[in-house]
Amino acid sequence: MEAIGAAITKNNSGYDSFCLTNAKNNNIKVSDSDPLNWGVAAEAMKGSHLDEVKRMVDEYRKPVVRLGGETLTISQVAAIAAHDHGVKVELSESARAGVKASSDWVMESMNKGTDSYGVTTVHGATSHRRTKQGGALQKELIRFLNAGIFGNGSESTHTLPHTATRAAMLVRINTLLQGYSGIRFEILEAITKLINNNVTPCLLRGTITASGDLVPLSYIAGLLTGRPNSKAHGPSGEILNAREAFQSAGINDGFFELQPKEGLALVNGTAVGSGLASIVLFEANILAVLSEVLSAIFAEVMQGKPEFTDHLTHKLKHHPGQIEAAAIMEHILDGSAYVKAAKKLHEMDPLQKPKQDRYALRTSPQWLGPLIEVIRFSTKSIEREINSVNDNPLIDVSRNKALHGGNFQGTPIGVSMDNTRLALASIGKLLFAQFSELVNDFYNNGLPSNLSASRNPSLDYGFKGSEIAMASYCSELQYLANPVTTHVQSAEQHNQDVNSLGLISSRKTYEAIEILQLMSSTFLIALCQAIDLRHLEENLKNSVKNMVSHVAKRTLTTGINGELHPSRFCEKDLLRVVDREHVFSYIDDPCSATYPLMQKLRQVLVDHALVNGESEKNLNTSIFQKIATFEDELKTLLPKEVESARGAYENGNTTISNKIKECRSYPLYKFVREELGTSLLTGEKVISPGEECDKLFTAICQGKIIDPLLECLGDWNGAPLPIS
């Protein structure tokens, strides 16, 4: 072997690294100041979560992913996974020499008679057996690992999603590029062609992610070697056999005859679990930010008190996730037209609602903060995993030896995915609690029950069905929060007696992501409904005030002979009643004697009459005598005025514009209403809540919500407002 050179370098985090370099181009980085890598891990957590999400989105949208083995990100994996995204993979040419060196070492060592696991020995618990037929051993490895069941159809529940397969191929290439696995560079180029030409092998379940994801990865190897049972999906979704797949991908040199160690290099890694985990975490980070903004919008439409976001409260708790969540909500609420209006309302009648908002609103930063920390830590853990060398044995060319270890154990995946799934379930629980308050007229500060918007609430039950659906989603999400990693079974003749279940946990977390997307879309549609109802409420209240004022002036100002009447002083108190009374508690029949408006207006007149004293005995100055006249005229005019205001609202000709346009949350509302073409739901229309939620769910799944979401936070400077 050739001599080892040494060099001091700076790694990405600024730490001094001592690099052992050999002529075969293998680099082993060991930091003098951070030998255990804790510093690098901590460095990766610096800065805000939102900035990190923005970087993810930027990376996701780049047209090329350049693989070198050490800089792959979860957003790049997610981008490649979305096969219609148009992102291409390029391999770093500088990695070729290192890959070739490890491949050559395997062949040289075998020719010398060196005994190496998986090269001259059989696999797993039967590694006591030896063979000199290295190529035949690789072929048998792929054959016996093809143990999955396709079932009926090409896209059965036993076949992994195309996105997961594409992610797995990308991650496996990245691992093998580092030159510790003993595989030819040409095989990595072939897998790259499959990705770039949208040819996706069909992978089956059946892995415990302990000796890597053996069974699913064996189907990639099976396609590369031309096994007759191999299947792939072509660019248009058509089913291809191995030969057709190679033709479609432009691989012209025929199927590969695997050399010693190459089959093991392909299958003995964590790429399927970590690839799917990367997809999951990209979505989880987006949903985490969305939950923060949704909580702020919830505070707006619920007329919440913004002091729950005050920086001092969260500074005293110390947790960075909580501090950032509160700062983001504070930014959304700062200057909000809803917050300003709610402040006036609270000042006018401080007893109208509880002194403190309920927990789903008031403690939302404390609830979401730790969950965001979990998701962020899991993101970094998986990012380390997809840049790791995770097969066995590892070929250390510089020391002329094969290292037998256990980097294939996917515990970082299983643990990260279990933790992420628990965080997703807790986010879902918060959204459900907020949704339940929003649709309940006992809690929602004047909004109608079930957010129904029709003229006749007896024939409109709004989001009642949606609340039932939300309960279903939340229950399933909480069930999925149960850990996978506690269900380990000893496998492979007790050789794999502890195993990570990484892919299983990733699959369950993938399910959890979809459910949280269902919940987020349903909740945001409901929030937009509430925003529109607040707009309708404001216009209806304005019309009621104008009519009450008009009727009061006509009937209460003067007496029979035109003289000023004591009842003229009632108008101010009558208007105060209108201001304080929730519009939707009476608006379907505003002059009904059983509804609070007419009762309280009459009570104002009665109270004034009681203090009118001796003047009540005189018909010309009696306020009691005016009550019937006032009520009769109001009953004649008010219903017509209310209907006129409703008509103006429906035609887009409102007197008062929608407050949401003055709020930082407006981009999300605008996206839902204008770009997706949703509208206020009523029992008078045919369209159902589910149809509107479906539009938003599809948009969320397609990533279309990202831009309006980030636009809401576009001018946030990354810090809380100063404590004043």
Swiss-Prot record:
Its main location: cytoplasm. It is an enzyme of class 4 (lyase). PANTHER family: HISTIDINE AMMONIA-LYASE (PTHR10362). One of its GO terms (biological process) is L-phenylalanine catabolic process. This is Phenylalanine ammonia-lyase 2. The active site is at 117 (proton donor/acceptor). It catalyses: L-phenylalanine = (E)-cinnamate + NH4(+). The keyword Lyase applies. Its EC number is 4.3.1.24. The modification 2,3-didehydroalanine (Ser) is found at residue 211. Keywords: Cytoplasm, Lyase, Phenylalanine catabolism, Phenylpropanoid metabolism. One of its GO terms (molecular function) is phenylalanine ammonia-lyase activity. Pfam families: Lyase_aromatic. Homotetramer. GO terms for cellular component: cytoplasm. (E)-cinnamate binds at residues 268, 356, 362, 392, 464, 492, 495. Gene3D superfamilies: Fumarase/aspartase (Central domain), Fumarase/aspartase (N-terminal domain), Phenylalanine ammonia-lyase 1, domain 3. It comes from Pisum sativum (Garden pea). Present at high levels in roots, with slightly higher amounts in roots with nodules than those without, and at moderate levels in stems. It comes from the Eukaryota. The lineage of its organism: Eukaryota, Viridiplantae, Streptophyta, Embryophyta, Tracheophyta. Belongs to the PAL/histidase family. PROSITE patterns: PAL_HISTIDASE (PS00488). This is a key enzyme of plant metabolism catalyzing the first reaction in the biosynthesis from L-phenylalanine of a wide variety of natural products based on the phenylpropane skeleton.
